[in-house]
Amino acid sequence: MERIPSAQPPPACLPKAPGLEHGDLPGMYPAHMYQVYKSRRGIKRSEDSKETYKLPHRLIEKKRRDRINECIAQLKDLLPEHLKLTTLGHLEKAVVLELTLKHVKALTNLIDQQQQKIIALQSGLQAGELSGRNVETGQEMFCSGFQTCAREVLQYLAKHENTRDLKSSQLVTHLHRVVSELLQGGTSRKPSDPAPKVMDFKEKPSSPAKGSEGPGKNCVPVIQRTFAHSSGEQSGSDTDTDSGYGGESEKGDLRSEQPCFKSDHGRRFTMGERIGAIKQESEEPPTKKNRMQLSDDEGHFTSSDLISSPFLGPHPHQPPFCLPFYLIPPSATAYLPMLEKCWYPTSVPVLYPGLNASAAALSSFMNPDKISAPLLMPQRLPSPLPAHPSVDSSVLLQALKPIPPLNLETKD
């Protein structure tokens, strides 16, 4: 039975056939040649596997080193200049990494500090909201402080209005003293102080009118009304109702208004001195002074008669001196046609309707030797009192002819 060749070598126990040669068994490979061929093939396979393993490993290592070098180059470019200047020469990879680590630590500390500040601010805002000190409370405190300061300033100026050498340093010192009193918790004002407060707030809106208007020098006695009204007197002069605050003088009778009218005459000079200290370019108009002097002799007409006249317009408290003096024509005789058409049928004199005198007294009053020029200005409409006799227009014409031009006196 023939032996089938296999891939394994023959066992050593079997003896080798002596007569077998290569030519004896055609188509059969000898065992020793098969073993040699097999060993060479295994060695070649192992070498190829090692080469194929080394090739991708080298590529991977090369790529990894390239990535590391690229990242280090980018870090070197991103480093601040002051860190680059700390080292001289070429920056090595290790130096670049150290500087990067130092810079990152500094940035981390800065971010931590900012976060702590933000947290502190947020906690402070929450505490402020809880305490109730919001924007509205601050506005109310500011308004109250401003009003207190303005009240103190006006009261101080009212007390020292007659003092001509008043300085701003004195006012500032007074305000500092009041502030110290308020901070200490003491009583700052007395109960009797609201009266000068009202007077000062009335003087405040009237002060710009006397300094801004050119022909408003005739309206200077508006301060006299506030001064007399704040002192508790109901003055009967025609300057009591300049802003509509003196309308109470209408309710008084004729007897109660005459002493106030006379007392106001004595106050005119002190107020004129005060106005002269403030406004130096123009003095008190002499027309007011003449009217006050005449009031002692002819104290029959009052401001209530002048105010109650409908000639003033719809507002009964409008000041009687608001009619500019320069609008009056040079001669009062120009009003004669109007007097004949409108006022002649009524039996009331034209000049001052409050004069309760007879026709003889009126003719004596119309005498140019006794009358003053400012009184001849046509002031008001007649009152409907039928007790006076009728006056002829010839008498009025005779009384009005010797009047000098009024515009020449008002220029003084």
Swiss-Prot record:
Annotated region (Essential for interaction with BMAL1, E-box binding and repressor activity against the CLOCK-BMAL1 heterodimer), positions in chain: 1-139
Gene3D superfamilies recorded: 6.10.250.980, Helix-loop-helix DNA-binding domain (4.10.280.10)
InterPro entries from the UniProt entry: bHLH_dom, HES_HEY, HLH_DNA-bd_sf, Orange_dom
Cross-link Glycyl lysine isopeptide (Lys-Gly) (interchain with G-Cter in SUMO2), where in sequence: K167, K279, K288
Consequence recorded when altering H57A: No effect on its interaction with BMAL1 or its repressor activity against the CLOCK-BMAL1 heterodimer. Significant reduction in E-box binding
This protein's GO CC annotations: chromatin; cytoplasm; nuclear body; nucleus
Gene Ontology molecular function terms on file: bHLH transcription factor binding; DNA-binding transcription factor activity; DNA-binding transcription factor activity, RNA polymerase II-specific; DNA-binding transcription repressor activity, RNA polymerase II-specific; E-box binding; MRF binding; protein domain specific binding; protein heterodimerization activity
Domain bHLH, first and last residues per copy: 52-107
Effect upon mutating K159R: Partial loss of sumoylation. Complete loss of sumoylation
Modified residues (Phosphoserine): S235, S383
Alphabetical keyword list: Biological rhythms, Cytoplasm, DNA-binding, Isopeptide bond, Nucleus, Phosphoprotein, Repressor, Transcription, Transcription regulation, Ubl conjugation
Coiled-coil parts of chain: none
Disordered as annotated region, ranges: 182-303
Subcellular localization: Cytoplasm; Nucleus
Basic and acidic residues: bias regions: 248-271
Domain Orange: 142-175
PTM characteristics: Ubiquitinated; which may lead to proteasomal degradation. Sumoylation inhibits its ubiquitination and promotes its negative regulation of the CLOCK-BMAL1 heterodimer transcriptional activator activity.
Primary localisation category: cytoplasm
Residues in cross-link Glycyl lysine isopeptide (Lys-Gly) (interchain with G-Cter in SUMO1): K279
Region: Necessary for interaction with RXRA and repressor activity against RXRA, residue numbers: 75-79
Record annotation: effect of changing P56A: No loss of repressor activity against NR0B2
BP GO annotations: circadian regulation of gene expression; circadian rhythm; entrainment of circadian clock by photoperiod; negative regulation of DNA-templated transcription; negative regulation of transcription by RNA polymerase II; regulation of circadian rhythm; regulation of DNA-templated transcription; regulation of neurogenesis
Quaternary structure and interacting proteins, as annotated: Homodimer. Heterodimer with BHLHE41/DEC2. Interacts with TCF3/E47. Interacts with ubiquitin-conjugating enzyme UBE2I/UBC9. Interacts with HDAC1, SUMO1, RXRA and BMAL1.
Functional summary from the UniProt entry: Transcriptional repressor involved in the regulation of the circadian rhythm by negatively regulating the activity of the clock genes and clock-controlled genes. Acts as the negative limb of a novel autoregulatory feedback loop (DEC loop) which differs from the one formed by the PER and CRY transcriptional repressors (PER/CRY loop). Both these loops are interlocked as it represses the expression of PER1/2 and in turn is repressed by PER1/2 and CRY1/2.
Protein name per Swiss-Prot or TrEMBL: Class E basic helix-loop-helix protein 40
Organism this protein belongs to: Homo sapiens
